[in-house]
């Protein structure tokens, strides 16, 4: 799906995370993250990719997800919970939040405030958002932007 395309959106912005989108993130979290929470887990793709990449490609103790939830879980082990009901106690043993959030800006912007108030947060979404007026209110919360390049999010 392109940003300027007219494809019909998938309900609840459910687009599983492709491996290609996760690989560039790994060097930035190695040595800093041992556990993470995934509050928009969907089918668990992002979790599997992070655990696979850190367990198989790097000679380290792999990074593991110790809490996963979604408004509509699509895999076992993912709790049913709306991200906006996520509490600090739910993820107190997680080092960070890492998620591929919904594309809808009204949800994304609320999610940025909510997640960053709980834990350091890594979000996978379009990098050019940083250069829009709507990002102005959120820029002070950002520490780093990692570009993942062009990625095919919808197979076919």
List the predicted regions and their residue ranges.
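Class I S-adenosyl-L-methionine-dependent methyltransferase catalytic core
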Residues: 1-156
């Amino acid at each position: 799906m392109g940003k300027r395309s007219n494809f019909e959106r998938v309900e609840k912005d459910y687009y599983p995370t492709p491996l290609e989108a996760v690989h560039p993130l790994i060097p930035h979290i190695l040595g800093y993250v041992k556990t993470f929470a995934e509050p928009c887990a969907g089918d668990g793709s992002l979790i599997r990719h992070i655990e696979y990449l850190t367990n198989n490609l790097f000679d380290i103790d792999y990074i593991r997800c110790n809490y996963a939830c979604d408004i509509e879980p699509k895999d076992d082990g993912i709790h049913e919970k709306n991200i906006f009901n996520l509490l600090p106690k739910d993820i107190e043993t997680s080092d960070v939040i890492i998620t591929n959030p919904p594309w809808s800006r009204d949800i994304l912007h609320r999610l940025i405030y909510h997640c960053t108030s709980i834990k350091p947060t890594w979000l996978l979404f379009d990098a050019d958002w940083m250069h829009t007026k709507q990002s102005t209110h959120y820029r002070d919360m950002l520490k780093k932007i990692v570009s993942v390049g062009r990625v095919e999010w919808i197979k076919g």
